[in-house]
């Protein structure tokens, strides 16, 4: 489906963008466009890749004209540009709105205007029962995606989303922080050892995007089933792997953090399709004419639990070690 097509990745110099780019470099895409604000990161990527297939566009998703220009002639879009640091978004919530909501709306609106065939937007588990500005902004992005999917012609453009838990070793995540602390002989700083988080690799995140590109219907949200770990077990696993005797300091939760995360709400689980490795949350196809539902009669309401990092498969320390060994950053540290 990608032969001689053009792909654009917003936020393409970040962790997700890099992973997607590496997967698609040897594909049949005619051109891959990297759209981001940071000219230095683009220059570093250009020098590292030396690949004529990859084109670079400097711009900001907040600026509709810049993303509209970049999307001319594009067939597929992966929207990864975002503000994702929870504490920062707590202090600057309107910045999160401008990038994660308005910016995402700009991308989707420009995708529709330019006849992009498929546009997949990246969301997060923090969008489910959100308590922080980052999660709220991503929840709004999902709502915008679903609303726009109702209005655009699916024969021309299909909008969908992928929702992730914690992506291991991505920029700003805890594993690179722990690794730096252990290698420097510093104490490990843990917010709450009982806090649980989903564990997902960058490769798995790309697999999910590919699945969405190939299978999405308008308004779909795709979620990968993932194991989880406590932060305490993650820290212990890394200490043992690096044979470190660093002390552990519990510093308490940061602004906006939750004890556990949810990938699907109870309401979403009630209507989700179980696809084996993934869940598909279809868009609610009902309209605002609720009178007809009284005429049609009662509908049974199924009861489900939400899908959380507390009730999914829980990895112990040994299980976390096996999972961490899949990461390049860990293997490189052990071989150093």
Predicted features and spans:
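Hydrophobic/aromatic anchor residues within beta-strands of the central parallel beta-sheet
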Residues: 56, 96, 119, 159-162
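Conserved Rossmann-fold NAD(P)-dependent oxidoreductase catalytic core, especially the SDR/UDP-sugar
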Residues: 79, 83-143, 147
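Conserved Rossmann-fold cofactor-binding substructure of NAD(P)-dependent oxidoreductases
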Residues: 55-76
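Rossmann-fold scaffold of SDR-type NAD(P)-dependent oxidoreductases
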Residues: 10, 71-80, 121
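Conserved residues in the N-terminal Rossmann fold of short-chain dehydrogenase/reductase
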Residues: 36, 58, 98, 192, ...
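N-terminal Rossmann NAD(P)H-binding glycine-rich loop of SDR-like oxidoreductase domains
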Residues: 5-27
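Conserved glycine-rich Rossmann-like NAD(P)H-binding loop of the short-chain dehydrogenase/reductase
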Residues: 28-41
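Strand-loop microenvironment adjacent to phosphate/nucleotide-handling motifs in alpha/beta enzyme folds
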Residues: 113, 143, 147-336
């Amino acid at each position: 489906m990608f032969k001689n097509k053009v792909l654009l990745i917003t936020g393409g110099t970040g962790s997700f963008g890099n992973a997607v780019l590496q997967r698609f470099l040897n594909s049949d895409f005619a051109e891959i466009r990297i759209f981001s604000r940071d000219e230095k990161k683009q220059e570093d990527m250009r020098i590292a890749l030396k690949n004529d297939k990859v084109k670079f566009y400097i711009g900001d998703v907040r600026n509709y004209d810049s993303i509209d220009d970049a999307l001319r002639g594009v067939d597929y879009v992966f929207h990864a540009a975002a503000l994702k640091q929870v504490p920062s978004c707590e202090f600057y919530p309107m910045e999160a709105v401008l990038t994660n909501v308005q910016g995402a709306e700009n991308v989707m609106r420009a995708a529709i205007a330019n006849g992009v065939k498929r546009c997949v937007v990246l969301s997060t588990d923090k969008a489910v029962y959100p308590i922080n500005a980052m999660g709220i902004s991503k929840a709004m992005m999902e709502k915008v995606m679903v609303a726009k999917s109702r209005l655009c012609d699916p024969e021309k453009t299909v909008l969908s989303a992928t929702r992730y838990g914690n992506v291991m070793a991505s920029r700003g995540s805890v594993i690179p922080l722990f690794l730096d602390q252990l290698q420097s002989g510093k104490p490990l700083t843990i917010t709450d050892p009982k806090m649980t988080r989903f564990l997902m690799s960058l490769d798995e995140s790309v697999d999910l995007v590919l699945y969405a590109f190939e299978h999405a219907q308008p308004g779909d949200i795709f979620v990968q089933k993932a194991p989880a770990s406590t932060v305490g077990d993650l820290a212990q696993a890394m200490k043992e792997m690096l044979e470190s005797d660093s002390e552990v300091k519990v510093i308490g939760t940061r602004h906006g953090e939750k004890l556990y995360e949810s990938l699907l709400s109870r309401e979403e689980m009630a209507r989700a399709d179980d696809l084996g490795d993934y869940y598909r949350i279809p868009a609610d196809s009902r309209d605002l004419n609720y009178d007809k539902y009284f005429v049609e009669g009662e509908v049974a309401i199924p009861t489900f639990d939400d899908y959380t990092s507390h009730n999914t498969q829980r990895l112990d320390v040994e299980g976390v070690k096996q999972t961490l060994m899949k990461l390049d950053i860990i293997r490189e540290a052990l071989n150093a």
